[in-house]
Amino acid sequence: ECHLIISKQDGRITHEIQIPSKGIETPVVTEGEFVITPEFYLTFPDRDKWILVNTSSDTIFHYLPDGNLSPFIVRSPSISSMDTKVFLFPTVITDRYCFMRTMRKEVDFTTFKGFLGEDLVYDKQENALFSYILYNDDFINKEEVSLTSEPRNPEIAICQTLDAPDLVEAYEKGQLKGKLKEIAANLDEESNPVVMLRLLPCWKKVS
């Protein structure tokens, strides 16, 4: 298992990035003929660096511009020591905070629901870890927002799609406020989805 750097010019693999691990641990669940693969990502942008995850490793690494790996997060307990595996994935990184989400390797095969997780944030200044729930304040009832969308680029923290029929219904029930209420007022059920972006603060590279 490794990360690959591929040339945009000709599609060649120019570099293989190996992350050491003691064995193979993966969130994929198998039960008889069933194979269930949850959605998860192993590469995340972080300013001028990249965060690389190997689900078999207890260490999450930074891949630096000079091509070297630097440890970023070391988890405890070790993934190999857990009876029920709980994986850790970064989601959004800022100057002060590292947002993450856990994923429990567990599925109820009567409902085919599972892979429950918890949202965590590490405060670099306070050296403290917290569990959190993020809400969209444009909903009166404060709809929960996930930071687990597909990684985009270093400037976009969240990219969430809101379906027009759901927004129209929420608007008619008086469940919206703020900018989202203004947008929903001009929608009908046949309108295109609304894309909500949350941008990270601007940053400058200092030499």
What is the role of each PLM region?
Residues 29-49, 87-100, 145-154:
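Structural signature of eukaryotic scaffold interfaces centered on beta-propeller domains
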Residues 69-93, 120-156, 162-163, 167-168:
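Conserved blade-ending motifs and adjacent loop-strand segments that build the rim/top face
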Residues 50-51, 108-113, 184-188:
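Short consensus segments that form the blades of beta-propeller domains
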Residues 3-64:
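Loop-centered beta-sheet repeat module
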Residues 12-15, 67-70, 127-130, 204-206:
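Beta-strand initiation motifs
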Residues 153-207:
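Blade-level signature of beta-propeller repeat domains, shared across WD40, Kelch, NHL, RCC1
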Residues 1, 52-57, 100-107, 161-164:
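Beta-strand C-termini and the immediately following turn/loop, strongest in propeller blades
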Residues 2-12, 57-62, 112-128, 187-200:
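Beta-propeller blade signature
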